Design a protein with these regions (language model features):
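N-terminal secretory targeting modules
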Residues: 1-61, 65-72, 81-83, 111-121
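Conserved SGNH/GDSL esterase-like catalytic core that processes O-acyl groups on lipids
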Residues: 57, 65-135
Length: 135
């Protein structure tokens, strides 16, 4: 589980968990959503024999949607990697934004975690509701 989620659970108070709240907390955080169903698992996706992305390197930068929150960290990056036989680099953290001036913003993570010397064929940046809901 992501450290931010754990911190959020602790901040919400352990009493909710102690009072039968574990099920409710898991349900609220997405662990019982359809995205976790076996029928949606990335391993079931057939790959394309011919794809313009085959063997290409694709970078995905984003927040929870890119990370695959509520789908056990399987999201469109894994789907595209499997379907199109490409190399995916996923840099995603729940609750982050493009514009915040903090250590886990998209820009900071791109600077800190993505090798500028790496050959990249496609760059996909997920703009999220986190940006719209923050100052």
């Amino acid at each position: 589980m992501d450290a931010k989620i754990i911190a959020g659970i602790l901040a919400a108070g352990g009493a909710a968990l102690a009072a039968g709240g574990v099920y409710r907390m898991n349900k609220k955080t997405g662990y019982f959503k359809k995205g976790n169903s076996v029928r949606y698992d990335v391993s079931r996706i057939p790959f394309k024999k011919t794809s313009p992305l085959k063997g290409k390197t694709v970078v995905f930068l984003g927040s929870s949607v890119t990370k695959g929150f509520a789908a056990h960290n399987n999201a469109f990056a894994e789907y595209i990697a499997k379907k199109d036989s490409c190399i995916c680099i996923k840099e995603a953290v729940n609750g982050t934004t493009l514009i915040d001036n903090c250590e886990d913003s998209y820009i900071e993570r791109m600077r800190d975690n993505l090798d500028p010397e790496r050959q990249v064929d496609l760059f996909i940046c997920q703009l999220s509701t986190n940006d719209a809901t923050r100052n």
